């Protein structure tokens, strides 16, 4: 999620209000104090956009490109045809999400599964090979009536303009709403399309989710059928707060291990 509790604790404006990270990263704050809500997310968004990539992103990008080169060395057409064949078999037995087509799923042997909401991975990596499972500050959604629940969000999702910046007062950490943060469909208040605390109205990105599910399913089938292939799960920057991410890696490894065991092989 956006920022850490440690960062928030150092902000004078929040300390004076006796507010912590969970108070601010809550959709109900939009109704309680609109400018404080937009100030918090505006600070995050401005900061994320100003932050340049560290070398870790370039290392991952080089690895991705190396995987592509290796796959192409073995015959790009052959790799695509194997992916297509596995995809078609899973589609035929209805083991893939409905509406997912093979061209909407990356056939690269590489995928980024992240809880980061800064959208930095999408600066360099193909959108089809990134799943931001908690959403992103670059994408906004209609907020509906958060306080009373009297009006559900209209399900409109939109991107912030690339040249947009929040007009943040750093003394109060407040920012006004703007046209860019207003729902273009119904004119209601907007909010980041980010999963927050106590969030019942977040609109999940089913397209990204389904793309990842389809990719993982195809890769698992290819690994099951070809024991010479290897699966690597690289976890970066995880701790006990990110159990959903850790469990996803374990699920993938356990699924492959079970299938190989059934074939009398060892992972």
Regions found by a protein language model. Give the residues of each.
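Conserved catalytic alpha/beta core of Sir2/sirtuin-type deacylases, generalized to analogous enzyme cores
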Residues: 1-267
């Amino acid at each position: 999620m956006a920022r850490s509790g440690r960062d928030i604790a150092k902000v004078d404006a929040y300390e004076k209000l006796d507010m912590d990270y969970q108070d601010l990263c809550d959709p109900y704050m939009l109704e309680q104090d609109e400018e404080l809500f937009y100030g918090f997310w505006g600070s995050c968004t401005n900061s994320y956009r100003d932050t340049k990539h560290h070398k870790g992103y370039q290392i991952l990008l080089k690895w991705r490109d190396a995987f592509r080169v290796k796959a192409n060395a073995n015959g790009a057409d052959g790799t695509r045809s194997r992916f297509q064949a596995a995809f078609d078999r899973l589609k035929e037995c209805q083991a893939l999400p409905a509406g997912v087509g093979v061209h909407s799923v990356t056939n690269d042997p590489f995928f980024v599964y992240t809880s980061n909401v800064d959208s930095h991975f999408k600066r360099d990596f193909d959108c089809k090979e990134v799943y931001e499972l908690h959403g992103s500050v670059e994408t906004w959604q209609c907020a509906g009536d958060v306080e009373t629940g009297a009006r559900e969000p209209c399900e409109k999702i939109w991107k912030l303009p690339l040249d947009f910046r929040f007009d943040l007062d750093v003394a109060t950490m407040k920012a006004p709403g703007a046209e860019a943060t207003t729902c273009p469909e119904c004119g209601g208040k907007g909010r980041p399309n980010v999963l927050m605390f106590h969030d019942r109205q977040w609109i999940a990105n089913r397209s990204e989710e389904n793309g990842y599910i389809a990719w993982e399913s195809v890769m698992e089938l290819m690994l099951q059928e070809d024991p010479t292939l290897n699966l690597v799960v690289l976890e970066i920057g995880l701790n006990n707060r990110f159990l959903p991410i850790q469990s996803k890696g374990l699920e993938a490894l356990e699924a492959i291990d079970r299938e190989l065991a059934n074939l009398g092989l060892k992972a």
